[in-house]
Each structure stands twice: as structure tokens, then as C-alpha cells.
């Protein structure tokens, strides 16, 4: 892995890895961390380019985020974990489970969608417009480049 992921860890026991949505970070799960830390080893990641985790040079894709999760688990000697993902975090968890089913004890998913074909046009259109605007200004603004990259997930 070309970066070190930032994370919060609380509690002990069976690993429960929390994966946030696009544009969020591990603080999204502050209430879940507090709730589950008495029963689990709760690990809330900041995925690549989110929160305190650096962007790095690898592709900014769900597939890469799943690779990062694998590397994170390998480095910390986590053989198997419960994965809880929200939105793009659910997408990361699903991708990871497809590629490494032996590493997943259970999946808890909310709002995941690996195939956006089922998303209502009224929901998708503002994202597409925002992406196009950000791409237009990406050459002149680092913030616009970052927004375009996130909206492109």
C-alpha cells in the first residue's frame, strides 16, 4: 500500500471494521464506536483521500479502497472481521467480500449500490452535474480536482 490509512480503534474482541461513505470520515461513526466498543474491537477507517488518510498515487476507486482494506487487515494481522459499511463504505465492503470472502465474518450494509443503473434519475442528475462542473474547474483548482474525483466514484 502506498499510504497508511488513518483510523480510530476502541475496545477489544472480535474485529468490527466501520467503512464510511463518500466525502465522510471515521468521525461519521462516533455513536456506533461508543455503542459497540464494549463488545467488539471497533476500527473506524478513514479511506484513501478522506479524513486524515492521504490520497496517495493509486487509483481513486472502490476496487482500490477494497485493496487498501485488505492491506490494512494484513498489516494488523486481522484474519477475519465483521464489515459495516454505509453508502460507498457498503460498496467497499461488498467489493472486498467478493474478492476475499474468507476474510469476512459478516456484512452489515446500508445504502450500497455497485451498479448505479438502479438509481433514480432525479437522484443521479445532481451528482452528474456537480461532477461535470468540478471536472471543468479541475485544471485550475485542487479543491475542484478533489471534488471531481470523489463525485466520480
Give residue spans per PLM region.
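Gly/Ala-rich beta-loop-alpha elbow adjacent to hydrolase catalytic centers
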Residues: 85, 89, 93
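Residue in the alpha/beta-hydrolase core beta-strand immediately N-terminal to the catalytic nucleophile
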Residues: 46, 82, 105-108
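Conserved acidic catalytic loop of the alpha/beta-hydrolase fold
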Residues: 64-81
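N-terminal cap/lid segment of alpha/beta-hydrolase-fold proteins
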Residues: 1-4
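Flexible "cap/lid" loop of the alpha/beta hydrolase fold
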Residues: 94-99, 105-137
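Conserved alpha/beta-hydrolase catalytic His-Asp/Glu region
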Residues: 118-122, 136-153
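Short beta-strand immediately N-terminal to the catalytic nucleophile in serine-hydrolase-like folds
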Residues: 65, 83-85, 110
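Conserved HGGG/HGGXW glycine-rich cap/lid loop of the alpha/beta-hydrolase fold
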Residues: 6-58, 72
Amino acid at each position: 500500500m502506498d499510504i497508511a490509512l488513518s483510523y480510530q480503534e476502541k475496545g477489544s474482541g472480535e474485529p468490527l471494521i466501520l467503512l464510511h461513505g463518500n466525502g465522510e470520515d471515521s468521525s461519521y461513526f462516533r455513536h456506533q464506536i461508543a455503542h459497540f466498543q464494549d463488545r467488539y474491537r471497533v476500527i473506524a477507517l478513514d479511506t484513501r483521500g478522506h479524513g486524515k488518510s492521504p490520497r496517495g498515487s493509486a487509483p481513486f476507486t472502490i476496487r482500490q479502497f477494497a485493496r487498501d482494506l485488505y492491506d490494512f487487515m494484513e498489516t494488523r494481522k486481522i484474519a477475519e472481521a465483521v464489515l459495516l459499511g454505509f453508502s460507498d463504505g457498503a460498496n467497499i465492503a461488498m467489493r472486498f467480500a467478493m474478492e476475499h470472502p474468507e476474510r469476512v465474518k459478516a456484512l452489515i450494509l446500508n445504502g450500497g449500490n455497485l451498479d448505479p443503473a438502479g438509481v433514480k434519475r432525479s437522484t443521479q442528475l445532481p451528482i452528474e452535474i456537480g461532477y461535470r462542473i468540478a471536472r471543468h474547474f479541475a485544471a485550475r483548482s485542487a479543491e475542484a480536482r478533489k471534488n471531481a474525483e470523489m463525485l466520480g466514484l
